[in-house]
């Protein structure tokens, strides 16, 4: 009977710890000019970008457990979104960023092992880089630079001359 009580207590403790393992929710919005510039850095996880017709950037998603800091800094012309991981390589969970940006905003995304998915951007410049994450892009930028060292690339579907 005592063994059963100990097992039940341990099981309940494990279940109670599950929410602590989940990441921290992200929900931030900043103004950005229609033709502003956004830079996004995320080491691991996923970065999804969708264009919309508002002059603001909205970031939602989940900050991975163990991440040091999430920052969204800048002004109406330039905005930088960065996920900072601890300098020591400890156990950190992936971060998922879902970013809505003005359709004409220039966009630069750099990741290491995070997938990148961009849809609907019609900017002057689009730059997407990932070391080992996959990249999918669909839009109409004037210039596009897409680099994946060991990840797959599904490139721009329509280019403006």
Residue map of PLM features:
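Positively charged n-region of N-terminal signal peptides that target proteins for export
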Residues: 1-7
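Acidic (Asp/Glu) and glycine-rich low-complexity loops/linkers
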Residues: 21-130, 136-148, 154-161
